[in-house]
Each structure stands twice: as structure tokens, then as C-alpha cells.
Amino acid sequence: MLEFFIEEKLLEDITMKEELLHQQTGINIQEKANLIWSIADSIRGLYKPHQYGEVILPMTVIKRFHDTLLPTREKVLEVYEKVKHLEVKDGFLQRASGYVFYNISNFTFDSLLADPDNIEENFLAYLNGFSENVQDVLKNFDFEREIRRLANNDKLYFIIQEFNSEKAYMGPDKITSTDMGYIFEELIKKFSESYDEE
């Protein structure tokens, strides 16, 4: 099921970067999965527990991409300003990001939270700033519908805020791709168990 929403080429690129670090992070998989699951509790009532995955899984993927790209964000934006008029610009932006994916939006989770009145519009603009390969991954979630639902019920800001906490950091310098895979498996298991409980 994990392959359904994460393209292998994106993970391979992150994995190559991790090998250069020459260290295992040794994070507590269960602890990180529990933290993410606790965020899901905030949408109780709006979603049934077995539906939490419709929000939590795409948000986890988005946060992973966000934290991975954050260190090279300024460089990508600088390069984008120079090449935005070109028809083919992916190679320049990929080199600037250091990955086979990038984001050209001016937003980060911090700046999204700084403008709560426009959080839905700005979050959609942030997602549209991702390279096409990431947008293809995100399309599998049909997440735009959930963003509207969260925004209409005053939950979108809170979800982004919780995913932006220091404990929810998911950059490859702290969480390897292998660990991330285990976290997803743990989350999927929790969603399945909650479905059985209903």
C-alpha cells in the first residue's frame, strides 16, 4: 500500500543523500507514529477514526517533502527567478534543491501559519509550487477536497500547526527513508485497527 502514494524515485534520491551522512538516526518509530496519530485526534467528529488517513497520510508526505527541501529553499527560489522564463527548467531547479523534486512557492509551514485568514488559499498555492513528480504523488490522495473540508471546519490551521511542531520534524537528517517507511506502516496499521474497532 505504501507504493501507492510514494514514488520510488523520490525516496531513492533521499536515500542517496542519507547514505552520505554515514549514520543511522535511530529514531523511535513508534514514538513518531504515535505523535502523528495524536494529531489525528484533533479531527475526531469531523472524520471517523478509519478516515483519519485521508488527512494524516498526505500531510505526513507533504511534511516530509517540506522538511527535506527547507535547507535549499532560498537557493531554489533564487534559481527559479533566473530560469522561470525558460521552457525547460526542471534540471536547474533539481540541482538547486539537491533532489529530483523541488518547490517554487514562497510559502513554508511557518509562513502559512503567519497568515491564518488565508491559510486554505496559501496552502493550495504551496502545494501547487511542488515539482510535477511530487504533484503526481499528491494527486493520488485527492487531498484538495480534504483541505476544503478542514478549512470549512476550522481545522486546517491546527493540523498545519501540529505538523509544524519541533517534534513533528521529518527531515532526512533525522529520519531515514527506511524509518519513514516504518512510520507509514505503523500509521496504516493504526488506521486499520481503528476501522476494526468501529
Across the structure, where does each feature detected by a protein language model lie?
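Non-catalytic, mostly N-terminal accessory regions of nucleic-acid modification and defense proteins
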Residues: 2-198
